[in-house]
Amino acid sequence: MKPFPRAEISSSALQNNLAVLRQQASASQVMAVVKANGYGHGLLNVANCLVNADGFGLARLEEALELRAGGVKARLLLLEGFFRSTDLPLLVAHDIDTVVHHESQIEMLEQVKLTKPVTVWLKVDSGMHRLGVTPEQFATVYARLMACPNIAKPIHLMTHFACADEPDNHYTDVQMAAFNELTAGLPGFRTLANSAGALYWPKSQGDWIRPGIALYGVSPVAGDCGTNHGLIPAMNLVSRLIAVRDHKANQPVGYGCYWTAKQDTRLGVVAIGYGDGYPRNAPEGTPVWVNGRRVPIVGRVSMDMLTVDLGQDATDKVGDDVLLWGQDLPVEEVAERIGTIAYELVTKLTPRVAVCLA
């Protein structure tokens, strides 16, 4: 018997999306970003489906170690870098690359004793102003890294875009120009493009692209949908009806009596709530998919349940599946209705939701 709620992960969708991104950036290698438990899709699930990726990007050392323990041999890169000097021997032992973005990391690399050098990607702050060495610091930092015997040569170079998900915002051009001017003539790989860069800014593609959300079939751009680019949603979030009730006009439903029926109808109660990661602030009218049609959420989302208006003539039954988002109901649409982004929806599912390959 299938569990519910469950996140059904499509291996064929993941593979399709990788192929689409390869075609989009045919001269680049692909570093598939699988941080945050593979964007909620299951870290090892995703990595095992994407065996043809050239490498994987992660946020935490623990994620990289999990991939190595799971048999993944591809290049791994810690996108936030290491946090402690005691991390460095683990990078060496497990052949894990690291981003360097801060003075404190350089000091640790200069002071630690290692059995072999670490592969480093120096992050340049080209305009996002979150992580990275500034243009003013770059020459000095680069020289220190080149002089450090604990760092493998060549040093690779990277940056991150602030506004690439706004295709008409030319700040991305400004960032590309700053990065390219600063790093001109230096050896090593270059990586600039995230999902939005790969899809919308072909000049940013470089030696490696670092797609995240697009791998999961989701567009990084507000108002857009991954299917417009040939991407396929990789997650179907599914639960089921646990009650179907006749409901009279002018009667409320749920906590706070937030919603009142305008006419006689049939309500369905769905076994999913904010305890599973479905947002409590989903407003009235947020769609779910039941038996081939959209129906609206009514009343407040509670911890374990939400209620939908099935309609006066509904024939839906207890036990029928309910799709919260996925191939028939894009997560981008649900996120826009709720007032958030698809990234947040897919990554905030709680452990009560079974994640399984479909």
Swiss-Prot record:
Catalysis: reaction(s): L-alanine = D-alanine
Residue positions where N6-(pyridoxal phosphate)lysine is found in the record: 35
Binding-site residues, substrate: 130, 303
Any Pfam family hit: Ala_racemase_C
Record SMART domains: Ala_racemase_C (SM01005)
GO terms (BP aspect): D-alanine biosynthetic process
InterPro entries reported in the protein's UniProt record: Ala_racemase, Ala_racemase/Decarboxylase_C, Ala_racemase_C, Ala_racemase_N, Ala_racemase_pyridoxalP-BS, PLP-binding_barrel
GO cellular component terms listed in the entry, alphabetical order: cytosol
Cofactor(s) needed by this chain: pyridoxal 5'-phosphate
UniProtKB keywords: Isomerase, Pyridoxal phosphate
Enzyme Commission code(s) on record: 5.1.1.1
Single GO MF annotation: alanine racemase activity
Homology family: Belongs to the alanine racemase family.
Family matches, as PANTHER family: ALANINE RACEMASE, ALANINE RACEMASE, BIOSYNTHETIC
Free-text function comment from the UniProt entry: Catalyzes the interconversion of L-alanine and D-alanine. May also act on other amino acids.
Protein name: Alanine racemase
